[in-house]
Amino acid sequence: MNLLPNKKIYFLSDFHLGAPNHAASLEREKIIVQFLGEIKHDAAEIFLVGDMFDFWYEYRQVVPKGYVRLFGKLAELSDAGIPIHFFVGNHDMWMRDYFQKELNIPVYYAPKEFERNEKKFLIGHGDGLGPGDHGYKRLKKIFRNPACQWLFGILPPVVGMGLANYLSRRSRAQTGSSEEIFLGEEKEWLITYCKDVLQQRSIDFFIFGHRHLAIDYRLPPLSSQGRGAGGEASRYINLGDWIRYYTYAVFDGKNLELKSFKGNENKIIRN
């Protein structure tokens, strides 16, 4: 797929709508909807790269209440013919077919490659990739297990959602609200994952979320495969979040930039 002149592809992640409370979430939702409205005129495609919600469980006949402004804007963009893709994150992995049926938005449960304007993108939320974090990887297998999803699904929605929201609040209280810190190339698991992929094939842009840091990192070539398809250095892009940074990536057919809707470009980590 090649972009038409003056058209762009946008990438966003980690809205965590629903957290930390209704008032703060609603304010953030309005900002996100404003941004989506402003890009409608030149968006050729939009990728939502996980953790749109702080928690989401989709019952067969019931979905969580709220988020009507966001859903309305996504429906408007989708109905206007703009393709939208959604990758589940660790906070909203329990999605079924609501997005596909109601919004015509496909849902992906694992990283996926796309090619645009002869550039190769590997896109995913980023949770559970790379070495380490074995406890979470085991937990993810449990959460993705159909039997576990069924057991949660037989709880009445008022009980299930109440329990999930309580655990989400407790998790935030335990982890605190301090900013994440870049650990360096050797300790960032997603950079290690990118390097491993580049040993096998060429990728121009790795697009992930999950880390809650805005990162634009040029990866060192590790082999004859360790560059992008055009021979340039591959780049690992982490999309940050819409809690502190309001960051997003945009691709114009030639160049990809990591930007902030709130002017927080000075917070972007680059090498």
What would you call each of these model-derived segments?
Residues 16-17, 53-54, 92, 128-129, ...:
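Short, solvent-exposed loop/turn segments at secondary-structure junctions
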Residues 2-10, 114-122, 219-220, 231-235:
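Beta-strand-turn-beta hairpins that frame and shape the catalytic cleft
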Residues 2-8, 12, 17-116:
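Core catalytic region of metal-dependent phosphoesterases/phosphodiesterases
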Residues 265-271:
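C-terminal regulatory/interaction regions
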Residues 126-189:
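Active-site-proximal loop/helix segment associated with metal-binding centers of metalloenzymes
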Residues 54-77, 176-206:
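N-terminal short leaders/motifs
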Residues 104-109, 122, 127, 133-143, ...:
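Conserved beta-sheet core of the metallophosphoesterase superfamily
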